[in-house]
Amino acid sequence: MRLSLTSIRGDLAGGLVTAVASLAFALTFGLVALAPLGPERAELGIRAGLVAAIVGNLVASALSGTALPVSGPRASITLVQGAFVAGLVADPALDVNATLVLSAVCVGIAGAFQMLLGALRLGTFVKFVPYPVIAGFMCGIALLIAFAQVPHVLGVASHAMRGTGLDWLGAVRPWTAVVSLATAAIVVLAARRWPRLPAALVGLLGGTALYFALRLLVADGAFGPTIGMLPGGLPLPTALADAPAVIASSAAARHLPSLVASAAVIAIIGALDSLLGAAAIDSVTATRHRANRELVAQGLGNLASALFGGVAIALSPAQGIAGWRAGGRTPITSYVSSLALLVLMLGGARALAELPLAVLAGIMLVV
């Protein structure tokens, strides 16, 4: 499409709408991917989700084979990444830095696999992966992630629930559970009543408003924590700097088979998710995507996300369609979205720090 003042205005409006629609997914799925690190490190997951929606989206959109490409963290692939991270966290020989490095390596290898699929022109064949196999696999992982939200929902420290006794019951915060369950209900209601609105964002806003309203009436100690301040500064491509040393360690060596297997699963599910999403965008934009180019673009986007410490990404049709309906017609829409999220991450860190974990846990229960 030829650029004009009208199209640029539409892309600017579409980009801002896309950024708003992407925000809740970036926060929630970033937290899903790194949730096994525990609530005390929730800010790492939040930042990783935002970095993916900024850097990964920027790179993938620049090379995409879809009319209006918007990429970011997706439930399907972040669930797989979260399961891999859970295995790393369970190993006492690995510290937090090693876990983050191996998680980034997993995303990077997944990106390389996707680039290979595209280069070999296997995009068409990815669609033939049996859906029941993927559905069963994802349901199993989703249950694990849902159980992992129990500490956030109840307002109890995750380490307190790892013992065999029930002493942690005395630490349960009922009001935290009220906020989480109310948030989940808002997401479900929004998805049914207002299908054109991003249900996760509606839940984020509604749940956060409820949280702070209740805090005016109930003592602060009755609620669980907020996510805390995000690590400051611009995202830099240093997440894999320690990868050679970490991978060479004996502690990491035993996780390499799981790392490669998880990367392959992320690559295949992400490829399938992206191609199905591209078809959905085609139906709205009356265009036709290029499957193999899209796989290469998503692979490069995942590699870029890994370099900057982000989580895995895939094409996000809901955000792309929202941008189209707001006037976006070119990839500039995606670039504006990434820029808007970057400004929010750098300038709105204090506001993001006040987001309640109970609200994000409620979103994860249903999304």
PLM regions: where:
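Transmembrane helical cores of multi-pass ion-transport proteins
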Residues: 1-367
